[in-house]
Amino acid sequence: MVLLCDLCVSAPSAFIPQYIGKYTRDSERETLNRKLVVLALTIIVYCCSITPARQGESSTKEDRAAATRVDRVVKEAMLTYKIPGVSLAVLRNGQIILLKSYGLANVEHQIPVKPETIFQSGSIGKQFTAAAIMILVQENKLSLDAKISRYFPDSPAAWKDITVWNLLTHTSGLGDYPPEIDLRRDYTEDEFFAAFKKAPLDFAPGTNWNYSNVGYVTLGILIRKVTGKYYGDFLQERIFKPLGMTTARVISEEDIIPNRASGYRLVKGQLKNQEWVSPSTNSTADGSLYLSILDLAKWDAALHTDTPLTQASRNKIWTPAQLSDGTTKGYGFGWHILNLHGHRLIVHGGAWQGFKTHILRFMDTKLTIVFLTNSWETRDFKFARALAASFYPSFALPDVNVIPDTDPKMTSLVRRVLMQFNVGKVDEQLFTPDVLRLVSIKAIQNKLNAFSLPVAIINSSELVGISHENNERVYRYLLTDFGSSLVCTVKLTQDGRISAIEVSSI
């Protein structure tokens, strides 16, 4: 069955722009603001009617109960993180069982989100780049074991052992965009590649794992070299059009595109439009796609079939990468692969230009959850986990209250330090003399590396406590992944140095 939510266009949505995304120290005004936002969201969601479809699976009591929980999770997230709009779908066996739209696609013009609304999807686009590569593999036009130097003869000597498989699995040693890449400047593919070549590899190909946007940009260039077509055109021809993904396409700020959502961010508590980037940096194969929730529902349905990807191809895509030392990393081709709470999941998120998104596929129960949001403030890993818990209580979030972050400079410092621990290299000047003799850098690194995407989760850490102890300030931060949570406790001296740091599971 399908639980359809048709969002009516109604005047009460006008409440949202006045209050969403604004913080105030005046508690009475804050309470009023929250009540008005609750009222606005309640009126908007009240316009949604849940009706059974003529085809598909029958409704179950569990589905209806879960739908109620999902609704509560979405509303709470929108209020907590000041998210203007959300589009969400839940599918089982490729059939939609819940489709809902919340809030505004465009705050300035009071345009509500609807199922046809298209969002920038960020790195969700990587799975489509990977699918395009596998189509070429299926047609014997490309080999996963092929050295990319065959297609890039001017690549540096350090790249000689990088294979197509390495690029797909983030095991190539290529890092992220080098410092000389300015996201506000246009580049040709040759100019991108010239900048990539200058950067040293982070490690020898196949020996380690590091999430690499550069690797997927390179895959997009490779698709053109093999097919003679821009990767976006290849996706249209071989995936989007055949599957009826009628609004899926590469991002364009210039084109007139119906139902396009606007992206937003908070600046000092005020809602602002997304930051601008150049057209060329918004058209690369690491995640530059417009997608609606309906497009992604059709994609999920296709992943239950042998079109466009055969079972053999899907198996390869969803196999965790194995490094040269025999260890495995929880990433295949454009998907994280996780085993959590007795479930096997394949997941991926996206974060780009005022949008955050996620798709979760429970492979054992054939349940898929997809959401698209138009706010950079969305804690997408935490949001995804809360939605999963609506169906599987073992994914429930820890009972820890997030508090307003009144010291963003401290938060920035803690995140910077955790980033250093994540790579195993810390700046000793940030600490008092004895700390690093008492703390195991490797132990903290191992805890952080257990996250599916440590960098993203560190950057989404949330303040959960501030106290004072022996003339020192004590800060506690929550880090949340799909199946686990950590609390980082940091003590700070009066001169601003870290006197203690602990990362513990909860």
What are the roles of these predicted feature ranges?
Residues 465-506:
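Exposed beta-sheet edge and beta->alpha loop/turn motif
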Residues 1-17, 21-28, 32, 37-40, ...:
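Short, low-complexity, charge-dense intrinsically disordered segments
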Residues 61-121, 141-146, 189, 198, ...:
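Short, conserved catalytic-motif segment at the N-terminal edge
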Residues 425-471:
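Short solvent-exposed beta->alpha transition segments
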Residues 347-348, 358-375, 488-489, 498-504:
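Short, well-ordered beta-strand elements
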Residues 373-439, 443:
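Short, gly/Ser/Thr-rich active-site loops of penicillin-recognizing serine hydrolases
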Residues 71-74, 88, 94, 118-145, ...:
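Active-site SXXK
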Residues 102-107, 159-353, 358:
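Short, surface-exposed loop or secondary-structure junction motifs
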